[in-house]
Amino acid sequence: MSKIAFLFPGQGSQFIGMGKELYEQVPAAKRLFDEADETLETKLSSLIFEGDAEELTLTYNAQPALLTTSIAVLEKFKESGITPDFTAGHSLGEYSALVAAGALSFKDAVYTVRKRGEFMNEAVPAGEGAMAAILGMDAEALKQVTDKVTEEGNLVQLANLNCPGQIVISGTAKGVELASELAKENGAKRAIPLEVSGPFHSELMKPAAEKLKEVLDACDIKDADVPVISNVSADVMTEKADIKEKLIEQLYSPVRFEESINKLIAEGVTTFIEIGPGKVLSGLVKKVNRRLKTIAVSDPETIELAIQTLKEENDNA
């Protein structure tokens, strides 16, 4: 069988009702949701299954909710005996990838991402930061735009390098507005403001990163059993000291997702399994290289289908 990477989604993929079937049908998944409730001392599971969508979207709720659901999907998928050669995640998804790789316990991870969400929320007063997706412009040209705007006194930088022609910028509200206009003047097809609560993956998140360091200091981070591709370096991380450092840097650094996928391709990965709600990452992978095989698993039905497909492929190999 060709090499497999497990990918884990980030914020934005959440929806009310995600993981509910797993909770009802898979004892290991139910234990995870119960453990999340206990660790966070709140009924996170009730919010996920039947809560208010706006409340679930709040950064400090969305992050533990997505992590819990992704790991619940993983628990069911693991029953198949299919194991990854690599794991990776998009922003918050990196924590799920580290749990999957044995570097972080679920309990430590769910607590940490709850605090991470709170710190990100507190870092910049509401309305002062912004993010926007810039379509149809390469990273080098867009970086010249953001550097120019920043030099003129309005901080803005590249935040998510998702796939060819799709880059998210982040910074002060004014910086993002000016960079969006300048990008369009310089050939970008579109600039789409994003509905987010803060300027994530920008220098403005440094106060949050300092607080996050204290939380990570208290975590029992281990060396990873499976290589994890870091958002910050787009390269392999396995050592616990490196993992901790990268998680802190990740808050104020760009997510180099396109480069991460290219790194996985270079390592021989041809099958990408997106584990958790939605199909956002599968779409991005296809935009990096449409010949790659992507499978998105999020509930008992899609998990069974994926297992069947992979086993048939293996039998035919």
Curated annotation (Swiss-Prot):
It catalyses: holo-[ACP] + malonyl-CoA = malonyl-[ACP] + CoA. Pfam families: Acyl_transf_1. GO terms for biological process: fatty acid biosynthetic process. The keyword Acyltransferase applies. Pathway: Lipid metabolism; fatty acid biosynthesis. One of its GO terms (molecular function) is [acyl-carrier-protein] S-malonyltransferase activity. Keywords: Acyltransferase, Fatty acid biosynthesis, Fatty acid metabolism, Lipid biosynthesis, Lipid metabolism, Transferase. Its EC number is 2.3.1.39. It comes from the Bacteria. Disulfide bonds: none annotated. The active site is at S91, H201. SUPFAM superfamilies: FabD/lysophospholipase-like, Probable ACP-binding domain of malonyl-CoA ACP transacylase. It is an enzyme of class 2 (transferase). One of its GO terms (cellular component) is cytosol. The keyword Protease does not apply. Belongs to the FabD family. This is Malonyl CoA-acyl carrier protein transacylase. The gene is fabD.
